[in-house]
Amino acid sequence: MAAERYNPRVAEAHWQKVWEENRTFETDNSDSREKYYVLEMFPYPSGRIHMGHVRNYAMGDVVARYKRAKGFNVLHPMGWDAFGMPAENAAMQNKVHPKEWTYQNIATMKRQLKSMGLSLDWSREFATCDVEYYHRQQMLFIDLYEKGLVTRKTSKVNWDPVDNTVLANEQVVDGRGWRSGALVEQRELTQWFFKITDFSEELLAGLDTLDQWPEKVRLMQRNWIGKSEGLQVRFALAAGTAPAGFSEVEVYTTRPDTLFGAAFVAISADHPLAKKLSEGNAALSSFIEECHQQGTSLAALETAEKKGFDTGIKVKHPFDDNWELPVYVANFVLMEYGTGAVFGCPAHDQRDLDFANKYKLKVTPVVLPKGEDAASFSIGETAYTDDGVMINSRFLDGMTPEAAFNEVASRLEKTDLVGRPQAVRKVQFRLRDWGISRQRYWGCPIPMIHCESCGVNPVPRADLPVKLPDDVEFDRPGNPLDRHATWRHVKCPKCGGDARRETDTMDTFVDSSWYYTRFTAPWENEPTDRKAADHWLPVDQYIGGIEHAILHLLYSRFFTRAMKVAGHVGVDEPFKGLFTQGMVVHETYKANGQWVSPADIRIEEIDGKRVATMLDSGAPVEIGSIEKMSKSKKNVVDPDDIIASYGADIARWFVLSDSPPERDVIWTEAGAEGAHRFVQRIWRLVAEAAPALKDVAPKAGTQGEALGVSKAAHKAVKAVGDDIEKLAFNRGVARLYELVNTLSGALQQAADGKADAEMKGALREATEMLVLMTAPMMPHLAEQCLAELGGKVAGKETLVARAPWPVFDPALVVENEIVLPVQINGKKRGDLTIARDADQASIQQAVLELDFVKAALNGGSPKKIIVVPQRIVNVVA
């Protein structure tokens, strides 16, 4: 009898209710089974989830459900990264309080995530804007302050003039604010910093232990930490050019081997010498002010046009007093990096070459590529940055750059310049301390108090939390806390006199730098329960976008170490395994030059071409390129619409099946339709065969078609398990398609009453295996199918969500036959299929029975038959 169509709306709502009522996915910290902690980067509550969320959380859910089935005690929590500027912007634009806006969005997105059927432990849910969470963050801040890992200092900062707040270097992208897109300016402010540089060497060395991280991410962090071994060289100022009080410029370089190619020295706009020279020099003062309009990050410097101001001052070359180099103030040198001064070797650094060409400075190559002639070698528009041998370098000529480095260092270390060595070897790091002060309201208050008599001191622990006031106004840019009539006024905890609260709040990346530890015991009064944290950490599998490679992931690695120093955790690394998934992308569409939504168009196949028109008017629509889903280009697919039309399982299945998970997946209506048909096919095959299989005990077949069914199922169990372990979800999906194709004929026979007892036993086992393997990807369908089969696995009543992963029989997975290529006189003519354990005599006899061998021998006998075991057969005629 034909089964009714599978109704995902009814089934999904039912099974989600069953899981919730049974508290199926709540995790007990006291469970003695081996732990497995899987976590996807928690979302910012922007208002609605998008298909990127669906893909990210579907991947994590596959891992969580699979590991549960494999017998692990799985922690799979969810929360909300809820502080940040968008809430304040919404408050200004829509006249709604950030708290109200945020919690409304959380409610909407939680409903959406629940509709996906994710196996999350919602009992551990928190938002970083919950007072209970940021209370513990303030406790952590004070702990780190007392351990000397928090400092307050004046420094150049990146100022976002639109968001009116400070940005960390990592938050400046191509010279612009990462959220506002505004050109960033430099300002000098007193800020709070986490001393991440105390861990520079540890953070770098730790990358070598993270063998389950993508190499690309490790390389990005390695470059950002930026360890370099170089030489700090003192260049004496030429007589008669230096202002009073200045006698030298100290330069840090990683390429002292190229000193004989030097064409100039460049100093930062904030270098003491530059400041001195700007006194009474309007042109230089104006140039320095221009330099301050760009960001303070190295990324900002790399993208900005390279500019310099010739100071007229000269320095002497370290190896030749008669060789003088011009000194420029340059916009690509930062005071915070190295010594705030560099020497430029145009031939072997592209930035220096561009600068030299712009200001018509001499370009002298000093490293000769292999195979080039020193007499004719010259530099064009591209600097030579590879290895070679030294030329035009006097006593260094003929050396390798490495040997030249050591020779220069050795000589200058022994050279006295005014009572000190002219150079010293130095290790530098690109990494800078993490400035966390933000001039905004919607963030975690920094728990410090300023007193004119006592200085700056922490808020007493008994007075925590420092809560954000609700009665604030967002009628103009800037920080409402600065303008609050009462909140900022407080008594000094030391002298009892009038004092004021710190009105800066913490960078929101602080909130996400330790949330994974809080999930291990979110009910604790302390920031962590040390026993629970040490049990669950590190996170076994972390999933999220590669855009967080430097920001969130590096900060989290620092925070774990800092929390270890403060006694809150016992591990160094937060995430054992890291997976960075690709994006969900979609075609773009335009009508009359305006972007239009996929929901508003119709696409048809006409004369072999895809033609798009507007649904309402029939107007033609231009089909554009495939791009990341974005609201601005309207190529967004709403998960709510997909789930309403097809169901959550189909949305999950499609984003897992269409491409390798590390690559982008292209969302198409045709792909969703294909997934829908597959779901209906599985349901029809199982439901129609269920009456014949419901009361049958599962048992592997031993012969004929029943054995074939069992072999296919057991091979799939092994392969799909291996695929999920490797996070190769698309390969696992492909194997399930294959298994359904293999089982379909036999299941139809069972539905028609044509299967014998052995086939029924084999089919019952194979169908249970299919259902259990499908469950991590399509959990609702799996539960519905098992219920149709009587709700039992291996004879025991269970939910699929609580059922163990099927176990394959190794004997059924091994191939008993082998295919051997057969050559005649060294050329392949065909293949021989034979038992894997066949001996040499049997193989030789079987080869002689092959038609193409008989034809080649023409009734005669071969001179010999060479058998390479398990590899190949060669007949010598």
Curated annotation (Swiss-Prot):
GO terms for cellular component: cytosol. SUPFAM superfamilies: Anticodon-binding domain of a subclass of class I aminoacyl-tRNA synthetases, Nucleotidylyl transferase, ValRS/IleRS/LeuRS editing domain. GO terms for biological process: leucyl-tRNA aminoacylation. Gene3D superfamilies: 2.20.28.290, 3.10.20.590, HUPs, Isoleucyl-tRNA Synthetase, Domain 1, Valyl/Leucyl/Isoleucyl-tRNA synthetase, editing domain. InterPro entries: aa-tRNA-synth_I_CS, aa-tRNA-synth_Ia, Leu-tRNA-ligase, Leu_tRNA-synth_edit, M/V/L/I-tRNA-synth_anticd-bd, Methionyl/Leucyl_tRNA_Synth, Rossmann-like_a/b/a_fold, tRNAsynth_Ia_anticodon-bd. GO terms for molecular function: aminoacyl-tRNA deacylase activity; ATP binding; leucine-tRNA ligase activity. Signal peptide: none annotated. A motif ('HIGH' region) lies at residues 43-53. Keywords: Aminoacyl-tRNA synthetase, ATP-binding, Cytoplasm, Ligase, Nucleotide-binding, Protein biosynthesis. It catalyses: tRNA(Leu) + L-leucine + ATP = L-leucyl-tRNA(Leu) + AMP + diphosphate. A motif ('KMSKS' region) lies at residues 628-632. ATP binds at K631. It is found in: Cytoplasm. Its EC number is 6.1.1.4. Its main location: cytoplasm. CDD domains: Anticodon_Ia_Leu_BEm (cd07958), LeuRS_core (cd00812). HAMAP family: Leu_tRNA_synth_B. Belongs to the class-I aminoacyl-tRNA synthetase family. This is Leucine--tRNA ligase. It comes from Brucella suis biovar 1 (strain 1330). The gene is leuS.
